[in-house]
Amino acid sequence: MPRQIELDKVRNIGIIAHIDAGKTTTTERILFYTGRTYKIGEVHEGTATMDWMPQEQERGITITAAATTAPWRLDGVEYRINIIDTPGHVDFTVEVERSLRVLDGGVVVFDGVAGVEPQSETVWRQADKYNVPRICFVNKMDRVGASFERCVQMIKDRLGAKPAIVQLPIGVEDSFRGTIDLFKMKATVYYDDLGKDIREEEIPAELRPAAEQARNELIEMIAETDDELTLLYLEGQELTVEELKRGLRKATIERKLVPVLCGAALRNKGVQKLLDAVVEYLPSPLDRPAITGTLPGQVMGDEGVEVITRPVSDDAPFTALVFKIVADPYVGKLAYFRVYAGKITKGSYVLNSTRNQRERLGRILRMHANHREDIEEVYAGEIAAMVGPKNSYTGDTICDPDHPIVLESIRFPEPVIELAVEPKTKADQDKMSIALSRLAEEDPTFRVYTDPETGQTIIKGMGELHLEVILDRMRREYKVEANQGKPQVSYRETITIPVDQETRFVRQTGGKGQYGHVKIKFEPLPPGSGFEFVNAIVGGVIPKEYIPAVEQGLREAMQTGVIAGYPVVDVKATLYDGSYHEVDSSEMAFKIAASMCLKDAVRRGKPQLLEPIMKVETVTPEEFLGTVIGDFNSRRGRIEGMEARGNAQVVRAFVPLANMFGYMTDLRSATQGRATSSMEFDHYEPLPEALAKEIIEKRSAN
């Protein structure tokens, strides 16, 4: 079956935003206008098509990044837009990370009233990390307190972006009725709230001067990004709409400018123009750099590692990245993947080069938010899902077995909060284990383990809401009821002074003995560095084949620290000397020696406990400002800054996670439900001595 849509007509985009900016509503409208949805789903009615999990429909927030294909015609040309809906709640940043990795462009939705919110900044930084070109949509222009100018100013100040305004709103709040196209210098006016009666008119006389000024600024901005256009502009030549749009497309893809549009998605205003802009300014897979990877078993960035490049073409060897695993109630496990190069037909075998295992693509689906179509073949630049993968997980590369390549995987943050769960009945024990392991397969920031001392099942995640949603899914999808303990903080341990440690592990019990001898220098690293292992052995005093065992022994020993049994972090270990025995040495002996060495070194290294610190932003009416600040102080918080936003005050603070449990509930009752807050993990820092002592005593009593 030949390719239906040319590669340069494909757009892979994500719709990214803060919680209530109206992202799912915007996506819904896109699906409606592109003809894939017959009745518009409303988030506040709980029927939105993209939010297909019951938890999302109840909470009115988006949790899973569903990938949807939508057709769009512009000037008689057919395009295919693949949309990945991403959540805006901070506990789900992992979803945002993994979708950004496979997108070519993003639509960032802002709330016209609140402007740039904390989560918008986080998401913007994540998009910067993956070099994703984007356009902005200022939504909710019909709401009381909306201000397009303020929102654009915040995009400049807070995000450090260069907004290129391509539309101006006509009216605001109740009187918002359309937009001015600064390229064509025409007004688009909406005469109903269904987006059916739309007319193109002359710009209202009172808005003409502002529109002309904005158009001149836009032309100047675009001309500055391109030498050819700059010359024409300086010579006083009139640039055509085509030249300007071409210039803006190039500047957007090079991330020099960010086009800004506006509308009110709920009232069906501005969404069609947004779709036009997606097609006009965001890149096709051909506009993005070719994907690079390494041969299996090699690490990108190491010396002498050959970098393999795969061109974006149907004729290149098949190369794809699995970016999401979903347990679908109808077809079982689904693996969403993005094809970077080549094509694949259903029924073919591919190599999962990350795990060196074969995978058969029995059925390939193209997804609409919750109905699916079977397809025969997937081509470069497309997004699809395979049914029932046996060996593939998030971040894995699947490729042509004759041309192996491993793409850079997706990196996920470590979980910061944990709780103990137990099934309500003995009979549910097995069901709970299956449910939790399946949920952990889907979500790399969710971990499950059994506490070796208490035998309890412990689940870890990115925040209270994250774990709440997981337990909720376990109840609904797997019918397992669980009791949960109080949330616990994941502390860490580290050393504060360098330590030189020598350890011998010798065991003679008749027959073959055990012998491992290591000298390792341990040094503290800056917070957030993790673990660094350096092999400085010269002259083969420890044979090469035992070095990995030493590193593995250290890594395993770091999982449980010495002072309170928490993981050890931010340590550099340099193996510089040791010895071995021709007969008695083995990998096991060196692993045990390294493990003992680490434990002894931590004891001598003036160890200390570290606690996770959350970055909190609370928006409160003026009259509760004192209450909010006082509350932060009582939670060992550090106020970082305050500013006015409209008629509200924004307080930013760093607060230990241990003091943030139940914060949202307390905040609501203290401010009559009028303050809102969001928090995300920021860094680890040393725990005050008195508190550390308390925790150590509690742990040793258990």
Curated annotation (Swiss-Prot):
InterPro entries: EF-G-like_DII, EFG_II, EFG_III, EFG_III/V, EFG_IV, EFG_V, EFG_V-like, G_TR_CS. The keyword Nucleotide-binding applies. GO terms for cellular component: cytoplasm. SUPFAM superfamilies: EF-G C-terminal domain-like (SSF54980), P-loop containing nucleoside triphosphate hydrolases (SSF52540), Ribosomal protein S5 domain 2-like (SSF54211), Translation proteins (SSF50447). It holds the Pfam family GTP_EFTU. PROSITE patterns: G_TR_1, G_TR_2. Residues 8-286 form the tr-type G domain. Keywords: Cytoplasm, Elongation factor, GTP-binding, Nucleotide-binding, Protein biosynthesis. Its main location: cytoplasm. GO terms for biological process: ribosome disassembly. It is found in: Cytoplasm. CDD domains: EF-G, EFG_III, EFG_mtEFG1_IV, EFG_mtEFG_C, EFG_mtEFG_II. GTP binds at residues 17-24, 85-89, 139-142. GO terms for molecular function: GTP binding; GTPase activity; translation elongation factor activity. Belongs to the TRAFAC class translation factor GTPase superfamily. Classic translation factor GTPase family. EF-G/EF-2 subfamily. Catalyzes the GTP-dependent ribosomal translocation step during translation elongation. During this step, the ribosome changes from the pre-translocational (PRE) to the post-translocational (POST) state as the newly formed A-site-bound peptidyl-tRNA and P-site-bound deacylated tRNA move to the P and E sites, respectively. Catalyzes the coordinated movement of the two tRNA molecules, the mRNA and conformational changes in the ribosome. NCBIfam families: EF-G (TIGR00484), PRK12740.1-3 (NF009379), PRK12740.1-5 (NF009381), small_GTP (TIGR00231). PANTHER family: RIBOSOME-RELEASING FACTOR 2, MITOCHONDRIAL, TRANSLATION ELONGATION FACTOR G-RELATED. This is Elongation factor G. It comes from Chloroflexus aurantiacus (strain ATCC 29366 / DSM 635 / J-10-fl).
